[in-house]
């Protein structure tokens, strides 16, 4: 149970009661979409630190409310922002900002201007490794395991979840 910004107690609900009351790993919690694990982490952090972390991953939405329920993900993030944020996991902690134009040429092929992607280290390599292990567990043993029924054997990770009010990223 966490205390909200208004002083009220708040506890998340889970869709199931798997391993209710047991000690579980963060890996198991993420793989099985266990909201209590997320709430536990929020108790160790705080909503303001989480908002700063979200922004460091390239999410530009300045209207993200620093509330305890943010640990479950209830904020608007565009698909582009989500893809940009996940580049840090594929690039050993370096977030690569999206870049759609790399150069501009005139009608004779002369380069007028070039552009390079902005890169920023947002997470340590050791944290990236741990996160990738957990994201792979979602697909290999957790709530995303059904994707393997389609014969997909590629190394991949994921994060499943639910939504309210048709707000999907």
Q: Residues of each region from the PLM?
A:
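Short, glycine/proline-biased beta-turn/loop segments that scaffold the active-site neighborhood
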Residues: 1-23, 97-110
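Glycine-rich, acidic and aromatic/proline-enriched surface loops and short helix-turn segments
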Residues: 1-2, 22, 28-35, 43-63, ...
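Second-shell loop/turn segments in exported
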Residues: 11-17, 25-27, 36-42, 67-73, ...
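Short, charge-rich amphipathic segments
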Residues: 8-23, 63-69, 133-146
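Short, mixed-charge, low-aromatic patches
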Residues: 1-12, 37-45, 84-90, 158-165
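Mid-domain, small-residue-enriched loop/turn segments at the edges of structured enzyme/sensor domains
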Residues: 6-15, 46-84, 100
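A penicillin-recognizing enzyme superfamily signal
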Residues: 28-32, 78-169
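Short glycine-/small-residue-rich flexible loop motifs, especially phosphate/cofactor-binding loops
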Residues: 39, 51, 154
């Amino acid at each position: 149970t966490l205390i909200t910004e208004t002083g009220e107690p708040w506890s998340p609900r889970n869709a199931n009661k798997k391993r209710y009351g047991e000690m579980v790993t963060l890996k198991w919690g993420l793989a099985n979409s266990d909201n209590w694990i997320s709430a536990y982490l929020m108790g160790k952090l705080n909503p303001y630190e989480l908002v700063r972390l979200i922004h460091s991953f390239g999410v530009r939405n300045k209207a993200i409310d620093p509330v305890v329920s943010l640990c479950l993900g209830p904020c608007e993030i565009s698909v582009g922002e989500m893809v940009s944020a996940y580049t840090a996991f594929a690039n050993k902690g370096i977030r690569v900002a999206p870049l759609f134009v790399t150069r501009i040429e005139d009608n004779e092929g002369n380069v007028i201007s070039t552009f390079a992607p902005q890169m920023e280290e947002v997470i340590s390599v050791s944290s990236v490794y741990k996160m990738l292990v957990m994201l792979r567990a979602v697909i290999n043993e957790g709530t995303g395991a059904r994707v393997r029924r389609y014969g997909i054997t590629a190394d991949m990770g994921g994060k499943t979840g639910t939504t309210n009010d048709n707000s999907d990223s």
